[in-house]
Curated annotation (Swiss-Prot):
Keyword Metal-binding applies: yes
Biased composition range(s): Basic and acidic residues: 270-284, 295-311
Cofactor note as given: Binds 1 Fe cation per subunit. Iron is tightly bound.
A GO molecular-function annotation: linoleate 13S-lipoxygenase activity
Domain Lipoxygenase span(s) in chain numbering: 223-932
Species per Swiss-Prot/TrEMBL record: Hordeum vulgare
Heme recorded as keyword: no
Protein name (record): Lipoxygenase 2.2, chloroplastic
Gene: LOX2.2
Length: 932
């Protein structure tokens, strides 16, 4: 007698022919008809034929018959389907009538959701696909978390092979979120049965009157490269991809799920035109095509969306209805966008803070930086109060404005200010944050002297820097020569000179904004910490003025005078505003959000949902397109928050394009290659990286995470691609990577550095790079924004006044008479500060349903024993990394991450426990995707 057995957790999936023991103890019978009906796995002495229905992706239908018995093609079996459905939620009371309409619809129509079972194999008689088995689902009166359960019973003939796909049609009047579909023998408990076929969908299904096409889903039991696709679903695999590509025509509707490409021609407005990003003049990655009509006032650009902040993204890329925090965030960003409009109309509402104490007054010392606020908490409070107070606030001035802001915004004290109220002032902290702050991706090694610009001298002025060998030696107290400092890797630099200099005169024409090209030089002390030794600010020559430039040093100007110390603090404001702008526009937006969107689009257009690489990358793409669309609508658009509160102003996105053109290379986006490019690491003879600064928290933690990601990707790839020819012959994989290059990044498609997917090593490097950028890279530059830049003197986003010494004797006299006033006038205005704080606070938050690296496991990974085992190894490595980071943060010798008043570096510490137990948002772990 055969008995049902349950596979061991982590056991590798076995071929169908070896799975005869996966039997069902009981099955449901129907009254007999001319066709004999048999329990699946029956152990009756009179019926010994067993039909296996559990391996839905087997290469062929297999039957096991004991000797002396024949297989009866007329046998049938009853299978049950359960479907979890989440109907669209309703937020406001005036929409409750929609819920009543739903109930009435269910009562009248009864069954509005149909399900079809599709065989994984062809009919051996016809050589064509089997006829599908269709049925209507009915409400089971059961619920599962936020989902209602629907079910149906299907009678299947034995000759129908296991389900290779399911197809659904929604005849309801509204869309629904499809959770999971389970197919299993009737009479079995799906939570205990080993014969369950699972379809993990998590997809919005439109009403049939909006989209008559049937929605297709494939089971998670096994992933297939194209050549291994079961014959019965080969056509469905191809047709699903064709549906997602669309035809490139027409305006996209909200319910569409089409992925296509377009240039960034939607950032301008009729009254504020902006150049198109993407093309020869302004190279840029591509974004998702919306198909909106061209603007009548600017034919090169799209019309604005009819609803402010509403931009098309494929339906399954949008936030789930259950993400109330995301919903409120979107509304608040819209309100902040309204503040930007107020700035444009009311140019006189740009008062400076009257004192440093007035800046500190914005924070509530009793309100600590808690990771999550209940039921929207702070965000809902801000939204409600903004709606009532916005008009009143913009009319206030001076102290009244500050007090009004305090009433509306209950800002927590950022960690940098909470740990040490004077941290922002210290030069040591200024230098430390280049290694462990919110932008640790810009610091680079100085490899030669003199420091020379690559810009045209005739256009911009002399190329040689004023930071000379003599100045360097003086600043390091002549303990070594400048040449020795270079040879011993003691000199490091923040270099924003060549990137910003071409925009200086254009930015200076804007109201209340200024800019320089800047270089900041640091010296590496014997204790492993950096200290700044010089800042060079440059204004390029113009038709009316000669080049102006000057070097500022800490405590050295005017022979160590007080005036020189104040000038040093002003110079730091300018450098920090450059660093903040570069961080937001390049390190953050360009290198993560913007450059990743083409990977997402190409993956959905070219990789089937049953493709193993799609299933590996899918969790790393979660919500990225929706966040990017919101950014285009409210953050990076004309007169948006970035333009109004960051130094480059309306030229912000042009600078981002220039950085993409001159700096971005896919092969340099992997952490090791990025460190090597900046001179921050070299590869030793043993292949291991040696850091130029041993205590470099971002690199120390990041390399551990990178190695874990790469090993996980390597194990995964090895499981599905035993040899290189499998990679080369995978048409979907090759088409995906070709499309990333030719359609997603077409302005760089002919660059020689694009890797070829021709072996295990190259594929792993490509996948690990994408996984790194979407997870750890983004976490490092995103979740430290408010903790570090939420206190404006520590990392101002804008500098509003030129250096007094540039402007002449009168400005210098005014500066000497009131240096603190000039310093405060150089910082962002009160309103700009509040806008930046509110925006960074939101962007730095974690979603309530965040999926964290090393903790979230896709259902498809769990179903494959080898993949599950590899993930467990990855998971353990991430836990080990978390423990290592904790040890380093307690190590007195690591002064860049531990010490009195020093904020520990935890941005790349993997989640180890419950994220809700974290003390700060920075400690909550590394999300899989570019998400907020």
């Amino acid at each position: 007698m055969q008995t049902a057995t349950k596979p061991l957790v982590g056991a590798r999936a076995v071929p169908l022919s070896r799975r005869a023991s996966f039997l069902v103890a009981e099955a449901r019978r129907k009254p007999s008809t001319n066709a004999r009906r048999t329990r699946v796995g029956s152990t009756s002495t009179t019926t010994t034929t067993t039909t296996i229905l559990t391996d839905v992706n087997g290469p062929a239908l297999t039957t096991v018959a004991k000797p002396g018995h024949q297989y009866d093609l007329k046998q049938t079996v009853e299978m049950k389907a359960t479907v979890s459905v989440h109907m669209k939620s309703f937020w406001w009371s005036d929409e409750k009538k929609e819920r009543a309409r739903d109930w009435a619809y269910d009562l009248i129509l009864g069954s509005w959701l149909t399900l079809e079972l599709v065989s994984s194999e062809l009919d051996p008689k016809t050589g064509q696909e089997h006829d599908v088995i269709s049925g209507k689902l009915k409400h089971s009166r059961e619920t599962e978390k936020d989902y209602d359960l629907y079910e149906a019973i299907f009678t299947c003939r034995h000759r129908l092979a296991p389900s290779g796909a399911v197809r659904l049609v929604n005849y309801h009047h509204t869309e629904m979120l499809l959770g999971e579909v389970k197919i299993f023998p009737a009479g079995e408990d799906p939570t205990k049965s080993s014969a369950v076929t699972l379809f993990h969908c998590q997809s919005w299904i439109d009403p049939s009157h909006c989209s008559p096409d049937k929605r297709t889903f494939f089971p998670v039991e096994k992933s297939y490269i194209p050549s291994q696709t079961p014959k019965g679903v080969e056509k469905l695999r191809k047709s699903e991809l064709e549906a997602l590509r669309g035809n490139g025509c027409g305006e996209r509707k909200k319910h569409d799920r089409i992925y296509d490409y377009d240039v960034y021609n939607d950032l301008g407005k009729p009254e504020s035109k902006r150049p198109v990003l993407g093309g020869k003049e302004h190279p840029y990655p591509r974004r998702c095509r919306t198909g909106r009509p061209r603007s009548k006032t600017d034919p090169s650009s799209e019309e604005e969306s009819h609803k402010k902040g509403e931009m098309y993204v494929p339906r399954d890329e949008t936030f789930t209805e259950r993400k109330e925090q995301a919903f409120l965030t979107k509304q608040l960003l819209s309100q902040l966008h309204g503040l930007c409009t107020g700035l444009k109309v009311n140019k006189d509402i740009l008062p400076s803070f009257p004192t440093l104490a007035s800046i500190d007054a914005l924070y509530d010392d009793d309100f600590r930086n808690q990771p999550v606020q209940p039921e929207g908490g702070k965000v809902r409070l801000i939204l409600d109060l903004l709606a009532k107070e916005l008009v009143h606030l913009v009319k206030l001035e001076g102290a009244e404005f500050v007090e009004g802001i305090r009433r509306v915004f209950k800002f927590e004290t950022p960690e940098i200010h909470d740990m040490d109220k004077l941290a922002w002032f210290r030069d040591e902290e200024f230098a430390r944050q280049t290694l462990a702050g919110m932008n640790p991706l810009s610091i680079q090694l100085v490899t030669e002297l003199p420091i020379v610009s690559k810009l045209d001298e005739l256009k911009y002025g002399p190329a040689d820097s004023l930071i000379t060998k003599e100045l360097i030696e003086k600043q390091i107290n002549r303990i070594m020569t400048a040449e020795e400092a270079v040879a011993q890797k003691k000199l490091f630099m923040l270099d924003y000179h060549d990137l910003l200099l071409p925009y200086v005169h254009r930015v200076r024409k804007l109201d209340n904004k200024t800019m320089y090209g800047s270089r900041t030089l640091f010296f590496l002390a014997d204790d492993g910490t950096l200290r700044p030794i010089a800042i060079e600010l440059t204004r390029p020559k113009s038709p009316h003025k000669q080049q102006w430039r000057k070097v500022f040093t800490p405590g050295s100007g005017y022979s160590g005078s007080v005036t020189g110390s104040w000038e040093w603090q002003l110079a730091k404001i300018h450098v920090l505003s450059h660093d903040t702008g570069y961080h937001q526009l390049v390190s953050h937006w360009l290198r993560t959000h913007c450059c990743v969107e083409p990977y997402v689009i190409a993956a959905n257009r070219q990789l089937s949902q049953m493709h193993p690489i799609y299933r590996l990358l899918h969790p790393h793409f979660r919500f990225t397109m929706e966040i990017n669309a919101q950014a285009r609508g409210m953050l990076i658009c004309a007169d948006g928050i970035i333009e109004k509160t960051f130094s480059p102003g309306e030229f912000s996105m042009e600078i981002s394009s220039a950085a993409y053109d001159k700096q971005w290379r896919f092969d340099m986006e992997a952490l090791p290659e990025d460190l090597i490019r900046r001179g921050m690491a070299v590869r030793g003879e043993d292949g291991k990286l040696e850091l130029a600064i041993e205590d470099y928290p971002y690199a120390n933690d990041g390399l551990l995470v990178w190695d874990a990601i790469k090993q996980w990707a390597s194990d995964y790839v090895a499981h599905y691609y035993p040899c290189a020819v499998d990679i080369v012959d995978d048409e979907e994989l090759q088409d995906w990577w070709t499309e990333v290059r030719t359609k997603g990044h077409p302005d760089k498609q002919d660059e020689p550095w694009w890797p070829e997917l021709d072996c295990h090593e190259s594929l792993v490097q490509v996948l690990a790079t994408i996984m790194w950028v979407t997870s750890a890279h983004h976490a490092a530059v995103n979740f430290g924004q408010y903790p570090m830049a939420g206190y404006v003197p520590n990392h101002p986003s804008i500098a509003r006044r030129n250096m007094p010494c540039e402007m002449g004797p009168e400005e210098m006299l005014a500066f000497k008479a009131a240096p603190e006033k000039v310093w405060l006038d150089t910082l962002p205005s009160q309103l700009q500060t509040v806008m930046v704080m509110a925006t960074l606070d939101l962007l730095s938050s974690h979603a309530s349903d965040e999926e964290y690296m090393g903790t979230h496991q896709e259902p498809a990974w769990q179903r494959d024993g080898e993949v599950d085992k590899a993930f467990q190894v990855f998971q353990k490595k991430m836990r080990d990394i978390a423990e290592q980071v904790e040890e380093w943060n307690k190590d007195d010798s690591r002064r860049n991450r531990h010490g009195a008043g020093v904020v520990p570096y935890v941005l790349l510490r993997p989640l180890n426990g419950n994220p809700m137990d974290a003390k700060t948002v920075m400690e909550m772990g590394i999300p899989n995707s570019i998400s907020i």
